């Protein structure tokens, strides 16, 4: 039976009032998480991976909280731009926490960490996502920078992949989309050699948009945010969709690859990489 119009209107109003209360709480910085910090102010949503003692490496809980925060910020009409960063001055994010290595994690209906869901969400939210790169962006952290729509880096920032050193790999956007961003040859170099790159080198290869002195990082990020907020949000949302269109096909291999990685994590080769990392020795893969 169809609900009366008065009842439907009451439901709509209750939902609207609830959404206003949530938005108001976040505006005052009241959104609480364990592994991240989330704050909305003057149209800017700031999401901070808050595990500085682990160089802002993520675990399953971190990913779930990031997904929740991006969902809130992405569909909050008061938000026009999202900034992703890491707590402290040492690291933006250094990828998966090898101290936990939750290859067997099965939450949210996934096999392994819900990274595919997080990566897709960062692309799907109709707001520009800016990476505020304040330090090391290594491994999965480097992938997050690559997926962000824009990236502004401190001159102290360091970039690179580490997956093959520890028996890990990102077979989706972390490799396939990286090749679109920096070029095929450079992407292969990044993954095959696991070298580290300076902020200026990252700028030259197109991984970041701008490099500034560390003390000026927040000023520059705020400047970009304010410029974005002055523009048509609908036009920007459409432009983001258009920019994503050509690389959305990567989702297919990402979905399959992320699930297949679970099998790799259970192999002796991958386990040797993790063991060597924890024991601070050179892995013996062969």
What feature does the model see in each segment?
Residues 15-16, 21-85, 120:
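Conserved CoA-thioester-binding segment of acyl-CoA-metabolizing enzymes
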Residues 52, 152-157, 208-256, 262, ...:
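C-terminal long alpha-helix characteristic of the crotonase
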Residues 150, 189, 193-195, 201, ...:
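Well-ordered beta-strand positions
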